[in-house]
């Protein structure tokens, strides 16, 4: 990712929330395939892992005070900057969060990161927030993960919301799509 003066713009050393959510999903999917193919040795070895992963995930990433997921955890503890990576943990087929936790993450993302064109990479309330990606290359690189809006993250937000709200979310999803009509007609896909 972006590096300025030899240092990462957004250092995320340690355990990242989305990587751990993807790992949990990979293990759960592998177990599903192993059961279907009757690979009992694999199932016996890996069956206890999802619950252990889920428990560790919640202990590491759940930020109890504000009720959302930390972006990453390192030797200094939780990084509680509000970033969009936590929505990935809510959008994957195998979830680790209870309904209340998931609702809280979605609400946090909606309040702090959702825009008509995507999710911000950092909450505007954060002092490191850069609302515009302009200037020379180092300046743009600094802004890249510090507030820039990424449309591709809407997929995860929409999946999480449909999972939480079902068809009741459809009108909001349609409104989100309408926000891209001009972009699609002018620039294409």
Task: Please provide the spans of the model-predicted regions.
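Short amphipathic alpha-helical face segments that pack within enzyme cores
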Residues: 22-25, 29, 152, 156-159
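Catalytic cores of carbohydrate-active enzymes
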Residues: 24-133, 182-189
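Non-catalytic C-terminal accessory modules of carbohydrate-active enzymes
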Residues: 107-117, 121-132, 138-149, 155-189
């Amino acid at each position: 990712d972006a590096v300025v003066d030899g240092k990462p713009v957004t250092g995320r050393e340690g355990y990242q929330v989305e990587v751990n959510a993807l790992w949990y999903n990979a293990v759960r999917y592998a177990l599903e395939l192993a059961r279907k193919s009757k690979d009992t040795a694999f199932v016996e070895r890996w069956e206890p892992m999802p619950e252990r992963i889920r428990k560790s995930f919640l202990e590491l990433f759940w930020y109890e005070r504000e009720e959302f997921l930390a972006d990453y955890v390192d030797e200094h503890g939780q990084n509680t900057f509000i970033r969009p990576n936590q929505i990935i943990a809510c959008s994957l087929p195998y979830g680790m969060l209870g309904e209340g936790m998931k609702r809280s993450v979605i609400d946090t993302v909606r309040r702090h990161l959702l825009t008509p064109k995507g999710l911000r990479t950092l909450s505007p309330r954060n002092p490191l927030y850069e609302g515009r990606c302009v200037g020379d290359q180092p300046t743009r690189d600094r802004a890249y993960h510090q507030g820039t809006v990424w449309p591709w993250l809407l997929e995860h937000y929409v999946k999480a919301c449909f999972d939480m709200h079902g068809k009741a979310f459809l009108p909001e999803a349609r409104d989100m799509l309408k926000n891209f009509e001009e972009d699609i007609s002018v620039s294409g896909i």
